[in-house]
Amino acid sequence: MTIMRKKHPLLKMINHSFIDLPTPSNISSWWNFGSLLGVCLIIQILTGLFLAMHYTSDTTTAFSSVAHICRDVNYGWLIRYLHANGASMFFICLFIHVGRGIYYGSYMLLETWNIGIVLLLTTMATAFVGYVLPWGQMSFWGATVITNLLSAIPYIGNTLVEWIWGGFSVDKATLTRFFAFHFILPFIITALVLVHLLFLHETGSNNPSGLNSNSDKIPFHPYYTIKDLLGVLLLLMVLTILVLFFPDALGDPDNYTPANPLNTPAHXXXXXXXXXXXXXXXXIPNKLGGVXALXLSILILXXXPLLNSSKQHGLMYRPITQVLYWIFXXNLXXXXXXXXXXXXXXXXXXXQIASICYXAIIIIFMPXASMIENSMLKLH
């Protein structure tokens, strides 16, 4: 009798995805972040489920219900801070995962890459509507500012914003629908993750050398199951330290003040989730241009396969593009730091330069460097 995992229809799927999956023998720790993202998603769905059991999505009671979770529910404080800081860990893993994809040329796996972009956008949307739910000052004004970006769309903008709000300002209707969105989106993300994996397993994983690894594959289990387990342990260690020692390090003190439509906070800081994209919006003086840049700063990822002019896969043997890549990464860090600051004159100028560099590196410098490398190596 053959092993059940190879015959049973359900177990067979799991077997081909996590056990007998042929995997390149040389994938580095940068390939751990996919499984870490899966773990983050599971943590977020579980903690979110338990939070939803005690949360009320009504403007009069939302803030109090979060306080009640932290004070009166057994381990409610733990669940709440795991959920809040778990989201931050989710985005850190997400940005590293995308950065790995850019570095090693994984964007050439087109379907996987495009679904990944959709996943990134959906996760950002989920984080945004989730941030509104505690109904603190930052929640309320963040919702007001971000939804107002849509009013820049010509002709239909204002109508669209009021339609999303369900009134003439962010109010009861907005909070209730945002809770509904925040509840359903993670399940949509889970479905997309399955499609993402389905397409990945059509081609198999890329690897650091960028060469075809079909001649040298090893089974996923036990080699990568144990490696993923180590990654998960490290992730949980960082998350635990964050939750138990510095639960509010990534939060905003203003969110401990209940939402007040009559009083604006000193500056609405973008949440960690969207900081990179928000820099583009803040830097451009024109409202419509800023909104367009905000969207394009993420959608430019879709153009990465089109802009690829190199004859090699990945940057392992391409020092010029490597230097550009790390300048790009440092530039993103600068953009994130500048976006978090208040919008003073100095910050705006820095963010403008960072935004110009962001676009220029992707569209102009990287393809040009690839061509130079091709000619230097006589790859015609």
From Swiss-Prot:
GO BP annotation list: mitochondrial electron transport, ubiquinol to cytochrome c
PROSITE patterns on file: CYTB_CTER, CYTB_NTER
Additional remark text: Heme 1 (or BL or b562) is low-potential and absorbs at about 562 nm, and heme 2 (or BH or b566) is high-potential and absorbs at about 566 nm.
Keyword flag Ubl conjugation: no
Binding site for a ubiquinone: 201
Name of the gene this protein is made from: MT-CYB
Gene3D superfamilies, A to Z: Cytochrome Bc1 Complex, Chain C
Binding note for cofactor: Binds 2 heme b groups non-covalently.
Keyword Kinase: no
Subunit structure: The cytochrome bc1 complex contains 11 subunits: 3 respiratory subunits (MT-CYB, CYC1 and UQCRFS1), 2 core proteins (UQCRC1 and UQCRC2) and 6 low-molecular weight proteins (UQCRH/QCR6, UQCRB/QCR7, UQCRQ/QCR8, UQCR10/QCR9, UQCR11/QCR10 and a cleavage product of UQCRFS1). This cytochrome bc1 complex then forms a dimer.
Names of the cofactor(s): heme b
Entry-linked CDD domains: Cytochrome_b_N
Protein name listed in UniProt: Cytochrome b
GO cellular component assignments: mitochondrial inner membrane; respiratory chain complex III
Record: residues binding heme b b562: 83, 182
Entry GO MF terms: metal ion binding; ubiquinol-cytochrome-c reductase activity
Matching SUPFAM superfamilies: a domain/subunit of cytochrome bc1 complex (Ubiquinol-cytochrome c reductase), Transmembrane di-heme cytochromes
